[in-house]
């Protein structure tokens, strides 16, 4: 469940939380739509498998802290890149909109430090962007709202979300074939939305349409647990678990309901259309369980594979919205209070993510990599909008790495193949997105550099 205090509509906050999958700008957390596949360039190039990976401080702090044991010398890694999203939104009334969104990734950093000599412990620190989004659509607002004739004309529909995780971890190696790890830290969450929205269930305002501008931020604790087993010198098996993260954020929600009030006629058209509320948002990030394996098939050839389970069904089942301390006396009078609650359906499905990849040592310090990821979209058609189209199913990636002495660099290109989803009958109130379709594709490039010292 996702709870929002002081936004003004299910569709609005649904857009904020879910649209992250549109940009695909998310490091960590290992989801195939709303989260990116891998936090560093090597992981991304291998399909996002991190549970069994070793030798990367960023990957260990992103998914499986047990992998810190694979660090033989202190190592610092930094990763940065950019994403390019293209999309198309078509509506049955002839509206056709295009999305062109380019954004830089907030850099990720990881530090791994082995403990004292002859003591089997390694420490790690990670600062990793778990979610990054800047989805920016522009299209004509469909007729709707109370009375069915309200439109705000051509409008920007923009949602931004950031979840930045800072964590401190440690791994112990009680036996040469076994590593255990855990990390603790905090996730900083920032949300913003500017778009038309419709109240979904508020008894007095259900169906009422207005413009919304919302901004909130907050912090919550986060944890990771992991294990790696090495049954032979050529095989590494890993498993990790991330409990759900509940983040309470505070901010403001403001808007303008002029078009809706004008459509209702006197006396509503004479009312001040502007409003402001204090915003308190409760966001729940799903629990994630991952398993994976690496196999050194030949001296130069390695294969990896992994599976993730993401519990979206419990985290994004519905959206509870509470508005408080409203500034507009007329709206407060109609509602009977300066606060209100609205509930919107999300009904996301649990997701299974399948990952596979291979890397080949070319020689001269160079390594070539390729990967593939598949996951059925967690977003059901009946609640999808252009801002929530985290619908990618297939991703392919290719990368190259170079290592010389204490230094290494890895580069990856990841392509989210074009995905299209059609909405038959939307269950969002007013049905503005019924008989609509969204097509999206994305390209991501990331560079990771590291140094041992």
Q: What spans do the regions from the language model cover?
A:
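N-terminal secretory signal peptides that target proteins for export/translocation
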Residues: 1-11
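Small-residue packing motifs within transmembrane alpha-helices
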Residues: 11-17, 177
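Bacterial N-terminal signal peptides
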Residues: 15-25
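Intrinsically disordered, low-complexity boundary segments flanking structured domains
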Residues: 21, 30-33, 63-68
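Outer-membrane beta-barrel porins/channels
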Residues: 30-47, 51, 104-453
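Outer-membrane beta-barrel translocator/receptor signature
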Residues: 54-63, 68-143
């Amino acid at each position: 469940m996702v709870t929002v205090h002081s936004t003004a509509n299910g569709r609005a906050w649904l857009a904020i939380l879910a649209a992250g999958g549109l940009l695909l700008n998310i490091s960590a957390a290992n989801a195939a739509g709303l989260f990116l596949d891998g936090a560093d360039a090597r992981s991304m190039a291998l399909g996002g498998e991190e549970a069994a990976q070793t030798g990367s401080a960023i990957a260990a702090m992103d998914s499986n802290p047990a992998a810190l044991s694979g660090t033989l010398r202190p190592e610092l890694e930094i990763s940065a890149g950019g994403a390019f999203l293209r999309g198309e939104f078509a509506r049955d009334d002839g509206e056709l909109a295009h999305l062109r969104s380019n954004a830089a990734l907030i850099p990720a950093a990881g530090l791994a430090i082995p403990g004292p000599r002859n003591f089997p412990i390694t420490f790690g620190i990670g600062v990793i962007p778990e979610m990054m989004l800047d989805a920016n659509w522009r299209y004509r607002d469909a007729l709707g709202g109370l009375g069915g004739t309200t439109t705000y004309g051509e409008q920007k529909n923009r949602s931004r979300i950031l979840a930045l995780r800072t964590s401190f971890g440690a791994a112990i190696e009680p036996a040469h074939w076994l590593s255990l790890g855990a990390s603790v830290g905090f996730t900083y969450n920032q949300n913003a939305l500017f778009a038309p929205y419709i109240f979904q269930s508020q008894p007095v305002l259900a169906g009422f349409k207005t413009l919304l501008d919302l901004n909130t931020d907050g912090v919550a604790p986060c944890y990771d647990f992991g294990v790696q087993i090495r049954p032979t010198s050529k095989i590494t098996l890993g498993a990790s678990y991330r409990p759900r993260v509940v983040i309470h954020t505070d901010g403001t929600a403001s808007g303008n309901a002029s078009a809706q009030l004008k459509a209702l006629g006197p006396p509503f058209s004479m009312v001040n259309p502007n409003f402001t509320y204090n915003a308190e948002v409760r966001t729940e990030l799903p629990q994630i369980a991952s398993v994976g394996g690496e196999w050194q098939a030949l001296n130069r050839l390695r294969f990896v594979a992994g599976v993730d389970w993401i519990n979206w069904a419990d985290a994004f089942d519905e959206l509870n919205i509470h508005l408080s301390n409203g500034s507009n006396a007329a709206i407060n009078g109609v509602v009977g209070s300066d606060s209100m609650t609205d509930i919107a359906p999300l009904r996301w499905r649990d997701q299974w993510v399948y990952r596979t990849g291979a890397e080949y040592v070319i020689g001269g310090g160079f390594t070539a990599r390729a990967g593939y990821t598949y996951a059925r979209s967690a977003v059901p058609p009946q609640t999808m909008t252009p801002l929530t189209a985290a619908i990618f199913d297939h991703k392919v990636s290719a990368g190259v790495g170079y290592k010389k002495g204490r230094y290494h660099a890895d580069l990856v290109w990841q392509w989210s193949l074009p995905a299209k989803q059609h909405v038959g009958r939307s269950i969002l109130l007013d049905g503005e997105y019924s008989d609509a379709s969204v097509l999206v594709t994305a390209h991501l490039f990331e560079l990771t550099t590291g140094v041992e010292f």
